[in-house]
Amino acid sequence: MDRKDFIKQMRSWQNGSITRREFLGRTGLGLAAAVVATQMPGLLTSKAYGADKAIGDRVVLATWPNYHNAENFAAFAEKTGAHVQMNVFGSNEEMLAKLQAGGSGWDLFVPTNYTISTYVELGLIEPLDLARLPNFDAASYEKRFMEQGIVDGKLYAVPKNWGTTGFVYDSDKIKSKPTSWKEFWELAKGDASGRVMVHDYQLTAIGNALKSFGYSFNSLDPKELADAEKLLLEVKPHLFAINSDYQPSMRNGDAWMSMCWTGDGSQLHRDLPNMQFTLGKEGGELWSDFFAIPKGAERPDAAYALINFLLDPQVNKLEVEAHGYPSGDKRVDALLPKAMLDDPIMYPAAELLSALEFGAAATLTSPERAELMARFKAA
């Protein structure tokens, strides 16, 4: 397989068209590393990230769909001998339940901002040793995208990426140019019946139903939740699927519209210009994701090495270019092409961002929201 074919397979994995297993089977990480070493030798000479000592043959990362650059993982494996094994999840509730159950096997994971205080309260994550993360520079990050990684004066998580939650639609199929969550739900019940996807994630599924009524994305008010539930139950028979990995169905035409995170919107629009990403005019979610290490992780040296490697600005630039999520690191922004910095999907106008809300910690463990989501999925 030549480099062109390898890159094609890598893109297919990144956009969700093939699984990680299929990617490895078709290419092999050895070949991947060879390509990276030849084409991007700078990746293999980053500031100390664990290459000076043995860190084992693998590192287990729990993360989200379509959220990493396979070439960077190959470069990391080539330099350290540790291959990255991914466990992919579609919600923070899933991640929390897995850690609470014990035996996750994770060495690091990617929680969202509003969940970190809960992980700390439950004793599920360790404070980070910044001496082992020389590529992390707190001064390079905007405060709002990193402050929730700090609990009681201790740093428990460092920023990975930030983004928004909107919806994506196929403009060849949906001609009305929707701009609101109200229109999203109306289309789901009407002209796009059978072709719409909703996240398998209570924060966004319930939150964006709430927004269509003008309520807070994080509402726990019983009446407001009842209104959201009524809407969700009305829509449920019309949905194509409830799934947080929606790129494959949007790409193959089974779905015409889906709740969508920034990077998925960027990837879809980049490859298929008819895919349009929209932030509902009522508002919605602004979020930031972090790297954290679970308490008792089996391979902490490998976890620190991988985090530090990915925080290298040159490496992080390649991450952003591949997945389309802003890093929040000014050093990385300075390396990105102007076309990306001007992309309104990645960097929405200030007035659009001002209408968005960060998720609230109380929603993660709210029994009312959990039960509502369970009824919605079971209907």
Where on the chain are the PLM-derived regions?
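A bilobed periplasmic-binding-protein/Venus flytrap-type ligand-binding module shared by bacterial periplasmic
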Residues: 168-173, 212, 288-302, 318
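A structural signal for short loop-to-beta-strand junctions that line the ligand-binding cleft
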Residues: 104-108, 126-130, 135-167, 194-196
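N-terminal export leaders
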Residues: 6, 18-40
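Mature extracytoplasmic/periplasmic domains
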Residues: 294-353
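Short beta-strand->loop
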Residues: 126-137, 157, 273-285, 294-297
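N-terminal secretory signal peptides
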Residues: 1-22, 46-47
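Early extracytoplasmic/lumenal segment of secretory-pathway proteins
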Residues: 49-118
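Ligand-binding pocket segment of bilobal, Venus flytrap-like solute-binding proteins
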Residues: 197-201, 205-209, 213-280
